[in-house]
Regions:
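Short, hydrophobic transmembrane alpha-helix segments
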Residues: 42-55, 72-78
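Juxtamembrane membrane-water interface segments that cap and precede transmembrane helices
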Residues: 40-51, 101-102, 168-180, 300, ...
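Aromatic-rich transmembrane-lumenal/periplasmic boundary elements in polytopic membrane proteins
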Residues: 119, 154-165, 280-315, 319-321
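Extracellular loop and loop/strand-boundary signature of outer-membrane beta-barrel proteins
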Residues: 110-113, 294-295
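Short, intrinsically disordered terminal tails adjacent to the first/last structured region
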Residues: 1-23, 310, 420-443
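TM-adjacent membrane-interface loops and short helices in multi-pass inner/ER membrane proteins
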Residues: 183, 303-342, 349-352, 356-362
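Alpha-helical transmembrane segments of multi-pass inner-membrane proteins
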Residues: 4-10, 21, 28-46, 57-68, ...
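Cytoplasmic-side transmembrane-helix entry/capping segments in multi-pass membrane proteins
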Residues: 80-89, 141-145
Length: 443
């Protein structure tokens, strides 16, 4: 069961005079609607038609419109302040500039990209507005974790029984499916976002954290069984990084967790990887081992995608060829013919530079890079760093079933950063605040 923050007399966090643990009805309903939309987007990713993505976008825009009309004056202080988070809202604007300036090679493709980026920016905004308190953040993190676990169980079950049928009903066109994901890489990216949540909570709760340990083992084993090499490497890195951070103790500077005896901590540090490895042996590790052993040319081929992509960025460094136009423009720069349609550069960062120029690359990169220190301070957010790295060899951003959760995590980290700064101001000048009666929290 989720462990909610306990009362303490150390720090008090207030939002317009409201205790930090309280989540009002408007926030709860809006948060639930947003969660349902993200679940819906993930559940329909296997559908090749446009209507699932379009209906997700319409739902997010409708939710944003309703929330702005009914609550903007009351929620205006919720969104993160500063240049970096503000840049997120300029990402879709860049596509509009390309359309208005007639610099895009395909107005249709750029318009679609603007809608997709606009929906992601709306998710980012809504998460910050809705999940403003530590208690709300706990609920959001646990919702993400439990949905990811359901998807992991579905993935493992289908890999052994479905023979390429999504939910045992819908043909995918592939020999295997990974929950509702046709691509094992996209599935791995989805799990990368949630795995650190399970690992970190398992280490925070000591011997009472067996439930989180099982969840972490399930998530990790599902990625190994899915046989995404980059996903397996990054999930392993996430697991080891959080274990090392907890063992070495660099997080003592912001430790606000329940104090555990050293014996309990040591035991949990041993149990988490043990359970992960055990679950991996149960579901099977040979496939991923074979993929690491095989000497295929997949990464060499990706370098042959990357070189023309960089060439595209060099030719139009300021404005790019238009958001979403890479598949149309790439053949003009290709250094080799391939017997398949290339829909992505398999490096999102390079593709951003090709589609939107260097300014667009910075519009996307800066908001994510700025929050990396917060992800290190709050390890439940390390999945954001993992997906950023995975984007160097694949394409998670064009898939809202992945990037929707990624932008939600981005919003949560900016909320955590604002909370940290509020705390620091409290410590520096406690005399200017009311006597504390509060919520102790450490996420």
């Amino acid at each position: 069961m989720p462990a909610f923050p306990t009362m303490s007399n150390r720090v008090e966090v207030r939002v317009k005079g409201t205790a930090a643990g309280i989540m009002n009805r408007e926030d709860l309903v809006a948060g639930l609607c947003l969660f349902i939309l993200l679940v819906y987007c993930t559940a329909t990713i296997f559908v090749k038609a446009a209507w699932p993505l379009q209906s997700f976008q319409m739902g997010v825009f409708a939710l944003l419109a309703v929330y702005l009309v009914t609550g903007i004056r009351k929620r205006e202080e919720g969104a993160a302040k500063g240049v970096a988070p503000l840049l997120v809202y300029f990402i879709p604007v860049w596509g509009l500039i390309q359309i208005l300036a007639h610099t895009t090679t395909s107005t249709f493709q750029t318009r679609e990209a603007v809608l997709r980026w606009g929906a992601l920016a709306a998710v980012f905004f809504l998460v910050q507005i809705v999940v403003r308190t530590p208690a709300a953040r706990e609920i959001a993190l646990h919702a993400m974790l439990f949905f990811a676990t359901v998807m992991a169980l579905l993935c493992l079950t289908q890999l052994f029984t479905s023979k390429g049928l999504v939910l045992w009903i819908f043909p995918s066109g592939y020999p295997d499916v990974y929950a509702t994901f046709p691509s094992y890489n996209n599935y791995a990216q989805f799990i990368e976002i949630s795995l650190p949540i399970a690992v970190w909570y398992s280490l925070r709760k000591g011997l009472q954290s067996w439930g989180y340990i099982l969840l972490a083992g399930t998530l990790y084993a599902s990625v190994i069984r899915a046989a995404s090499r980059a996903g397996a490497a990054l999930c392993t890195a996430e697991l080891l990084a959080i274990l090392a951070m907890r063992a070495i103790g660099p997080l003592k500077l912001n430790r606000r967790e329940t104090k555990l005896r050293m014996r309990s901590i040591t035991l949990v540090l041993a149990l988490v990887p043990l359970v992960a490895v055990t679950f991996t042996f149960v579901v099977g590790w040979r496939r991923i081992w074979q993929r690491f052993q095989q000497h295929d040319d997949s990464y060499l081929v990706r370098s042959e995608f990357l070189i023309p992509t960089i060439d595209m960025a060099v030719h139009r460094p300021l404005i790019g060829y238009g958001l979403g136009t890479f598949p149309d423009v790439y053949p003009q720069y290709a250094i080799k013919d391939f017997p398949f349609y290339l829909n992505s550069a398999h490096n999102d960062w390079a593709e951003f530079a090709a589609d939107g120029g260097i300014p667009f690359l910075l519009l996307v990169l800066i908001p994510f890079a700025a929050v990396v220190p917060t992800a290190i301070r709050h390890p439940w957010g390390l999945g954001l760093v993992a997906v950023m790295l995975h984007a160097c060899v694949d394409f998670p951003f064009p898939r809202p079933a992945v990037s929707g959760w990624l932008f939600a995590m981005l919003g949560l980290l900016y909320v955590a950063r604002a909370s940290d700064r509020h705390e620091d101001r409290f410590k520096i000048s406690p005399g200017r605040h009311d006597p504390p009666t509060v919520l102790e929290f450490k996420h």
